[in-house]
């Protein structure tokens, strides 16, 4: 192709800038599908589709590459404040998308839980799936994790739970 490493880095202002640009592009690609899934149909179905897409991506990648953003969070965010900020922003964007879908849901489907608390749970669960994938766990384990994760929408929040709808401590 004729592109040398130095000229590639120079085109982006350096190796670090190339990395950050790649991270941004990866995020945008992920959100094109994620937002579409969460905006179409029921909240439950949209959330299922997001999780199934992640499992499908894991299967296509042979289950060992993981997610660029999750891998960045695990490997680099602790030592790099700018990268940590971008990763947190990404996670917050995902959380916001889940919350928007859940906020459109009929109250009975939330089982008495706050949409934001559920969105945080789903965001953490999705990242956990990606870490498991990176470790090479079998797809069966990922599918089981998705089913159990989605089952939270089938069971009422425990009485006295801090994640119950209307709890002021749930910011």
Whereabouts are the PLM-identified features?
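Short, basic, alpha-helical segments at the C-terminal edge of helix-turn-helix-like DNA-binding modules
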Residues: 24-30
């Amino acid at each position: 192709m004729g592109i040398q490493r130095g000229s590639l880095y120079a085109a982006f202002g350096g190796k670090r800038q190339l990395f950050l640009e790649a991270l941004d592009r990866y995020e945008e690609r992920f959100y094109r599908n994620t937002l579409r899934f969460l905006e179409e149909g029921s909240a439950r179905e949209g959330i299922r589709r997001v999780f199934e897409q992640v499992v499908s991506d894991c299967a296509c990648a042979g289950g060992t590459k993981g997610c660029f953003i999750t891998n960045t969070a695990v490997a680099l965010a602790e030592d790099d404040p700018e990268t940590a900020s971008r990763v947190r922003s990404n996670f917050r964007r995902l959380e916001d998308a889940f919350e928007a879908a859940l906020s459109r849901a009929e109250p009975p489907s939330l089982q008495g839980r706050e949409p934001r608390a559920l969105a945080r749970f789903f965001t953490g669960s999705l990242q956990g799936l990606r870490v498991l994938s990176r470790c090479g766990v079998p797809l069966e384990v990922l599918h089981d994790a998705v089913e159990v994760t989605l089952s939270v929408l089938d069971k009422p929040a425990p009485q006295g739970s801090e994640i119950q709808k209307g709890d002021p401590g749930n910011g």
